[in-house]
């Protein structure tokens, strides 16, 4: 086992992890940045709509929209922090330093879009590939920064804590403290130890524990599961947001249909052309996501139809092709001309409003363990997230966590012990069993812990998942670790955490909707 020592270990190289790495490097810190895949394989890369850049004289209106979308449950301190600090975070990194190619009008001013739940236009964008444009620029800057070492194909296995993984016997009595992680190099199959003064979880969300998801493969709540195993507090995990509009066609892949379409005039209709959202919410098709997703679910249950539709007829064809080229091209690949035809859509798991509980500087209850981005939960989103807040949250949480970590490290007082050697098993896990277990897990979560839940459904889900966890733990104890086995182990733990949180909360709020009966 090789041991690598650094100032900061960042697990996840999406926007939050990469922005943290850049901010930490500017303070003279050495950073190890781990990612499952290459630099652009992250949920941030798939964000289509945009990022909030609110320079209005009335920022309190944005705060109002965030709280309203959350059904009145958002943490006021977290909301105020994002509204106050968000514009500077965007200006400093994305506009001044990286000059990201956001869309501009004929005068050179940033174009502003509107999405569901927003009372005004305040979202900047790069066509319908905003996340890709941002992450591409950020990743290039990361790769040009000597203080940052990118480790693609390195997967965190478990966090290191003094009481469990130090080779110093006296550390078993130490306060709960993280000092890095065991990490699998998937290219060699070897497990190494990365020892760090600060460990930052930026591993994204958990959407792939559900059968239908907008998330990248591997988004199974890695950071949430690992932090739970070392005693970190998790909160609000019952609040899983389902995006209302994901492309649906038999034998075609599911992909996100950006909410910005509805901001520009697209409306949801059923197979008869009826605008069913108009009778449900004053904003109609621009209602908050939880309301729209649930309305679609109920519409489909009542009609027996497989999908609803987005009607884009309010937009001119040239505007659609110019503003939404990615959506137009991907739909065309599957036989839908969005300038003339309705887009068939269904909801899918999209974003975890809950996560590892942190303060506004990313600190968890485990010393020297931080969490940022979607992995973390400050209470910003409460029971439901407002559209286009996710990328902004990534930037602000990364910035302030890195600044706090820089100050802590400069103050000194860190002791990094030698970790215990990793004990590798020899037997290979059966890949067929792993695939089947993951499929069962995802189907269970979709059917029993999805958009609408009941106590009996959740009880059934918990029973199935507990049996699965026993089998998976046996794999993990007896077999050599692989990426697939790590993902399965973390997926079942995260799924159980979501089901447990949902079972404890009988109150329907936002994304968590409880019904009586089977």
Give each language-model segment a name:
Residues 4, 23, 27, 38-40, ...:
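Glycine- and aromatic-enriched mobile tails/lids
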Residues 37-67, 71, 241-244, 252-255:
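Conserved N-terminal glycine-rich FAD pyrophosphate-binding loop of Rossmann-like flavoproteins
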Residues 198-255, 302, 388-400:
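Glycine-rich loop(s) and the adjacent beta-strand/alpha-helix scaffold that form part
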Residues 76-87, 122-140, 151, 213-221, ...:
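Short beta-strand to alpha-helix junction loop
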Residues 8-33:
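N-terminal Rossmann-like FAD-binding beta1-loop-alpha1 element of flavoenzymes
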Residues 3-6, 189-198, 365-368:
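Core beta-strand elements of the Rossmann-like FAD/NAD(P) dinucleotide-binding domain
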Residues 94-190, 195, 202, 246-249, ...:
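Conserved redox-cofactor binding core of oxidoreductases
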Residues 226, 232-341, 404-410:
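An anion/pyrophosphate-binding glycine-rich loop and adjacent beta-alpha core
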């Amino acid at each position: 086992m090789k041991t690598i020592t650094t100032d900061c270990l960042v697990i996840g190289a999406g926007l939050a992890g990469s922005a943290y790495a850049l901010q930490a490097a500017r303070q003279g810190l050495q950073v190890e940045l781990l990612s499952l895949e290459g630099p652009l394989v992250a949920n941030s890369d798939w964000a289509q709509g945009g990022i909030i850049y609110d320079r209005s004289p009335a920022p309190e209106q944005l705060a109002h929209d965030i709280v309203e979308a959350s059904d009145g449950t958002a943490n006021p301190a977290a909301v105020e922090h994002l509204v106050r600090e968000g514009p500077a975070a965007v200006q400093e990194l994305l506009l001044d330093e990286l000059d990201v190619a956001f869309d501009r009008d004929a005068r050179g001013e940033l174009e502003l879009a509107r999405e569901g739940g927003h009372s005004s236009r305040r979202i900047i964008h790069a066509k319908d590939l905003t996340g890709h444009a941002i992450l591409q620029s950020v990743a290039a800057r990361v790769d040009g920064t000597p203080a940052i070492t990118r480790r693609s194909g390195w997967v965190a296995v478990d966090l290191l804590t003094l009481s469990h993984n130090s080779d110093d016997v006296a550390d078993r009595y130490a306060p709960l403290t993280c000092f890095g992680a065991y990490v699998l190099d998937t290219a060699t199959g070897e497990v190494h130890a990365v020892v760090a003064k600060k460990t930052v979880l930026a591993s994204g969300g958990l959407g792939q524990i559900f059968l239908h998801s907008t998330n990248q493969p591997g988004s199974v709540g890695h950071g949430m599961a690992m932090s739970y195993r070392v005693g970190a507090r998790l909160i609000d995990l019952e609040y899983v947001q389902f995006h209302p509009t994901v492309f649906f066609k038999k034998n075609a892949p599911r992909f996100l249909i950006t909410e910005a379409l509805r901001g520009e005039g697209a409306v949801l209709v059923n197979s008869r052309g009826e605008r069913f959202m108009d009778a449900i919410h004053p904003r109609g098709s621009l209602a908050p996501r939880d309301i729209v997703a649930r309305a679609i679910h109920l519409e489909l249950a009542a009609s027996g139809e497989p999908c609803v539709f987005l009607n884009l007829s309010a937009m001119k064809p040239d505007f659609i092709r110019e503003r939404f080229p990615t959506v137009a091209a991907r739909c065309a690949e599957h036989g839908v001309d969005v300038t003339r035809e309705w887009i068939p859509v269904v909801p899918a798991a999209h974003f975890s409003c809950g996560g590892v509980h942190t303060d506004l500087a990313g600190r968890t209850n485990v010393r020297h363990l931080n969490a940022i981005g979607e992995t973390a939960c400050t209470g910003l989103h409460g029971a439901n997230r407002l559209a286009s807040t996710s990328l902004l949250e990534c930037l602000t949480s990364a910035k302030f966590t890195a600044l706090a970590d820089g100050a802590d490290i400069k103050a000194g007082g860190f002791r990094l012990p030698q970790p215990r050697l990793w004990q590798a098993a020899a037997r290979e896990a059966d890949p067929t069993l792993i695939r089947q277990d993951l499929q069962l897990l995802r189907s269970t979560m979709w059917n029993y812990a999805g958009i609408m839940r009941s106590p009996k459904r959740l009880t059934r889900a918990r029973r199935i998942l507990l049996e699965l966890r026993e089998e998976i733990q046996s794999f993990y104890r007896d077999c050599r670790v692989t990426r697939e086995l790590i993902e399965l182990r973390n997926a079942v733990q995260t799924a159980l955490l979501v089901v447990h949180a949902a079972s404890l909360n009988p109150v329907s709020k936002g994304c968590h909707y409880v019904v009586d009966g089977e």
